[in-house]
């Protein structure tokens, strides 16, 4: 009886493991370098480590991802270029980095467009977001999903921002993008394009008065050490794009690609959950660190929208009127047709 039980168990084990054998045979050793500009303790970095864990679990330890944080491999622009050239495997730039390569990506950064994280998820995970990702291979990139950066807010070292007019004259670092330049110049600031990796030092040395980023980045990057004032302006929603070099992707087997895609999907869920939890506590931590936080009243938000109408009109056309209209239609659906 014991022998029969053992034989039955062995047969079941063989049946369970047999389907895995062909997959294992098609999975080779891979370690993907992942470069990011943010710090090692930022939620984005935590999500990269989660991605690495899922890769290892799904590949029997054969596939892995190695994180290089704090701009060790360059800024978003240079790392994205490295992916296209095949000298770096992965990076996670702000979607605005891609608009110089593919103009329709710019619609995601149109100011005052998104209201909630939920509608951003619906847009990016739905047909519209997938259509954008499908444009990447022609530029030597593979899009594995959209991660959340969050709603952006303005900080500065000079004064509290209580009205739209209070922004006037501030020298603010912005992402190296014409859209960001025009957005903040329209609001009366002196917009200064600069790589994120240079930002802390620039604020410390008073080369710029301030910057704009989501709370998680402000806290993790310790901007509270060199910035006194934070206004919850919610002027723009910001998404990251999880990218792999097409040259790397093309060198993977079908089984390896499936593992990467599955790990990326799981890491996307993890990243959004992690950064939202982190952001909920970030404002309290920033207050404890000495930052003075203000919120623009609805009337002042309306003033921002009025000032930005020419920017919205200009870039709505530049990024493609059809694309812009499609995005707004999808957002209307996400809002229940409101």
What are these regions (language model features)?
Residues 1-31, 336-338:
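Short, low-complexity disordered leader/linker segments with a strong preference
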Residues 26-119, 127-338:
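N-terminal secretory/targeting leader peptides
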